[in-house]
């Protein structure tokens, strides 16, 4: 458009000059002071128009997010340049009007002075050539490549021009702000995931991010939309102990085979989970005494609604009160759907609700703790009539009365974050939901060959000696049963 305006102006002005007889007969003498002045002004206008054209492309192509990134993670020189440009680029529409206005003035003034120096045909050719080469192509090519550096070096000129053009540029810029609005500076989650995938090595575009890095970043972005029900282990696939069962050799073998650090404890019905048992607390329990599960220390297991976001669960797990929770199906729905709960939670208190005193009974002077089993003795993450960190409206009573549908652990949350299953030495299934098996035979044989298993069988076979020196013998069938118990299929729940 600038080229067309320049050509049209040159033709019009040439025609006017010829009709008035000012420049139709003879041009300004070459080499005179007037000729040098007009030539200098023409060169200045071409140079000025080129700077305005280049700054228009260079500055307007720098987004606010890009400048923020450069200020935080760029080189010292880039940080300095981005900090100088950022206040100017914030006024995008006013900056655009200022640069275009100054560029148009320079372009329209160029034919006037060229017409004084040459005839109409030469003025048109020179105007088009200068404007195309030095006013458009070269400046925009340079500013496309070095927009940040050029913009930082000419930011003083831009500030002066914005001040001079303020009466015109400011009102027009405000109107554009109201009509068009501001550009959305931040990326959405889907855009961030696409940006990360583009920078991966697998994309083949020169990115440096490995597959694991892109997977973890994508998992972290998706974690806010996932709920406890998606990551939990179903209660049917969970290994748990009855509170009235005995910690005999068979029970100890099952616990050893599973390899869990925590085991849920239920009363009567496996869905009536009342607490959890730390396996390390069984170090002092002797299997031959057949101690009841209710006689050992049972910790409270917190309860979470099935639609609770995984980030909220992760935050509670990080407080250290528990790394296992029972997932319950609460009647009714929360007022705020999980997919819209994207704001970061800021908690004024550093204390977790899980650190409340346990509702336990102590019998006599014994240190063993017995849980009241009349009702599931769990505790939710939220207190009565309080919303969860992301605005959930579930009350503690509703969560307490909800049906337990699964168990979720810190490992389950990490697996969703990594988007890969974490398989340890005792796992039989890579994915419990899809029933994808690990090498079950190899896992079972490795457990059977373990020295700890042989010692456990030897201790059970020899038993404890009584006061008369008699030894309790264990039949061979019971030993086979014990070995089968240890090597039976494993169902992991943490």
From Swiss-Prot:
Which keywords belong to this entry? Answer: CBS domain, Glycoprotein, Membrane, Repeat, Transmembrane, Transmembrane helix
Q: How does it sit in the membrane?
A: Multi-pass membrane protein
Which interval of the chain is the signal sequence? none
Q: Which residues cross the membrane?
A: 44-64, 94-114, 122-142, 160-180
**What's a GO cellular component annotated to this UniProt protein?**
membrane
Ranges of residues in domain CNNM transmembrane:
31-213
Residue span of region Disordered: 459-494
The GO annotation for biological process reads: magnesium ion homeostasis
Residues on Extracellular side: 1-43, 115-121, 181-494
> Which residues point to the Cytoplasmic side?
65-93, 143-159
Q: Give the CBS domain ranges.
A: 232-292, 297-352, 364-425
Q: What is this protein called in UniProt?
A: DUF21 domain-containing protein At4g14240
Can you name the source organism? Arabidopsis thaliana (Mouse-ear cress)
Q: What is this organism's lineage? A: Eukaryota, Viridiplantae, Streptophyta, Embryophyta, Tracheophyta
């Amino acid at each position: 458009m600038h080229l067309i305006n320049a050509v049209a102006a040159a033709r019009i002005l040439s025609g006017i000059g010829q009709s008035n007889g000012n420049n139709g007969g003879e041009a300004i003498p070459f080499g005179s002071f007037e000729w040098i002045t007009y030539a200098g002004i023409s060169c200045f206008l071409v140079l000025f128009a080129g700077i305005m054209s280049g700054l228009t492309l260079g500055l307007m192509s720098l987004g606010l997010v890009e400048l923020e990134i450069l200020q935080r993670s760029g080189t010292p020189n880039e940080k300095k340049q981005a900090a100088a440009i950022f206040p100017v680029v914030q006024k995008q529409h006013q900056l655009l009007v200022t640069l275009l206005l100054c560029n148009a003035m320079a372009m329209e003034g160029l034919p006037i002075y060229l017409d004084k120096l040459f005839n109409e045909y030469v003025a048109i050719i020179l105007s088009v050539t200068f404007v195309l080469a030095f006013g458009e192509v070269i400046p925009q090519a340079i500013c496309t490549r070095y927009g940040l550096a050029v913009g930082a070096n000419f930011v003083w000129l831009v500030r002066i021009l914005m001040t001079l053009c303020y009466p015109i540029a400011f009102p027009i810029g405000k109107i554009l702000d109201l009509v068009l609005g501001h550009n959305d500076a931040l990326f959405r989650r889907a855009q961030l995931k696409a940006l990360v995938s583009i920078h991966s090595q697998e994309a083949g575009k020169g990115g440096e991010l490995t597959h694991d890095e892109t997977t973890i970043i994508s998992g972290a972005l998706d974690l806010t939309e996932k709920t406890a029900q998606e990551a939990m282990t179903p209660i049917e696939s969970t290994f748990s102990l009855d509170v009235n069962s005995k910690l005999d050799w068979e029970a100890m073998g099952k616990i050893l085979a599973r390899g869990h650090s925590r085991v849920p404890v239920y009363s009567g019905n496996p869905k009536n989970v009342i607490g959890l048992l730390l396996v390390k607390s069984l170090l002092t329990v002797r299997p031959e005494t057949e101690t009841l599960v209710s006689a050992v220390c049972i910790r409270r297991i917190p309860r979470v609604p099935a639609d609770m976001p995984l980030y909220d669960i992760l935050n509670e797990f990080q407080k250290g009160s528990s790394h296992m929770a029972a997932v319950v199906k609460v009647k009714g729905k929360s007022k705020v759907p999980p997919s819209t709960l994207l704001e970061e939670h800021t908690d004024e208190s550093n204390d977790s609700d899980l650190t409340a005193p346990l509702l336990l009974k102590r019998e006599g002077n014994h240190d063993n703790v017995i849980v009241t089993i009349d009702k599931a003795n769990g505790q939710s993450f939220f207190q009565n009539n309080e919303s969860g960190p992301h605005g959930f409206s579930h009350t503690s009573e509703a969560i307490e009365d909800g049906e337990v549908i699964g168990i979720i652990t810190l490992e389950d949350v990490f697996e969703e974050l990594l988007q890969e299953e974490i398989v340890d030495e005792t796992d039989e299934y890579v994915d419990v939901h899809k029933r994808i098996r690990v090498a079950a035979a190899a896992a079972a044989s490795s457990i059977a060959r373990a020295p700890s298993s042989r010692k456990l069988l030897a201790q059970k076979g020899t038993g404890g000696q009584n006061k008369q020196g008699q030894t309790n013998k264990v039949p061979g069938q019971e030993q086979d049963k014990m070995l089968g118990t240890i090597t039976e299929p494993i169902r992991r729940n943490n």
